[in-house]
Regions:
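A generic short-segment signal for beta-strand/edge and adjacent turn/coil regions
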Residues: 1, 5-10, 42-45, 97-101, ...
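Bulky hydrophobic/aromatic packing residues
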Residues: 24, 37, 46, 110, ...
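Active-site capping/gating segments
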Residues: 7-16, 20-23, 193-225
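Active-site-flanking structural segment that lines cofactor/substrate pockets
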Residues: 31-67
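The AdoMet/dcAdoMet-binding core of the Class I SAM-like
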Residues: 52-181, 189-192, 205, 210-216, ...
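N-terminal auxiliary segments of SAM/dcSAM-dependent transferases
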Residues: 1-41, 47
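Loop/helix-junction capping segments adjacent to catalytic residues or to phosphate/diphosphate-binding pockets
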Residues: 48, 82, 196
Length: 225
């Protein structure tokens, strides 16, 4: 995802396609300009159809480690525009199961409607299950359930859409994630910028941390992590 102020004339130069309420308050907006789509909140770009490098890299790094696993179970927090999901499916084998938890129902509806061409049929892949649910609750559904959990939720450890998402990244949230991972499991987290405090929380929770900095597709932007 990209969390930045919409450049130029802002959203005034974009055509609104739809809005979707965020549970707990606020709304997401789906807007279009020519062939480019954005999902935005409060004038801030959350994700765009023309910039997806860090989302794909999140899946490549985590799921690449599962390439030889016979039947991995992967949880993706946040559907977005499907870039993480598509990248995961490209790496994982035919017996994999990928569950995507998306809190905002409109995002799922857009994936099957005006953004269907962006998703390129990945929601119909038999390995995929979409749950309209808080990924935090899915994580709490049972111990040693997942071989990998990929979180591209909100703005990473610094919430933008909903402060409730901070629960994923605080100490208790990380402990729950570790509890729900199988032995040797991986937690992949998208972040808009490096965060030493979050890295320290991961380490205190028992995770071995490797940080990957991905160059932003916009010149001059802070690398994504």
């Amino acid at each position: 995802m990209r969390r930045s102020r919409v450049p130029g004339a802002g959203l005034a130069s974009w055509t609104e396609i739809d809005t979707g309420p965020i549970p707990g308050g606020g709304a997401l907006r789906l807007v279009r300009r020519d062939e480019e789509f954005l999902i935005a909140v409060d004038g801030m770009e959350l994700m765009g159809s023309h910039r997806s490098g860090s989302e794909r890299e999140l899946a490549d790094l985590a799921c690449g480690a599962l390439r030889d696993h016979p039947a991995p179970r992967v949880l993706i927090g946040g559907l977005g525009m499907g870039f993480t999901l598509r990248a995961a499916l490209a790496v994982l084998g035919p017996q994999a199961r990928v569950v995507v938890a998306e809190l905002v129902p409109a995002v799922v509806a857009w994936a099957r409607g005006p953004l269907a061409h962006v998703f390129a049929g990945c929601l119909d892949d038999p390995r995929v299950e979409i749950r309209e649910a808080d990924v935090n609750r899915v994580i709490q559904s049972g111990p040693e359930t997942w071989d990998a959990i990929l979180l591209d939720v909100d703005n990473g450890p610094h919430s933008l859409v909903s402060r409730a998402n901070d629960r994923l990244y605080d100490s208790w949230g990380l402990k729950r994630a570790r509890w729900s991972l199988r032995p040797g499991g991986l937690l992949g987290v998208w972040s808009g910028c490096p965060d030493r405090q979050f890295k320290a929380r991961l380490q205190r929770t028992g995770f071995a941390v490797t940080e990957h900095r991905i160059r932003s597709e916009r010149p001059g932007r802070t690398p994504h992590v």
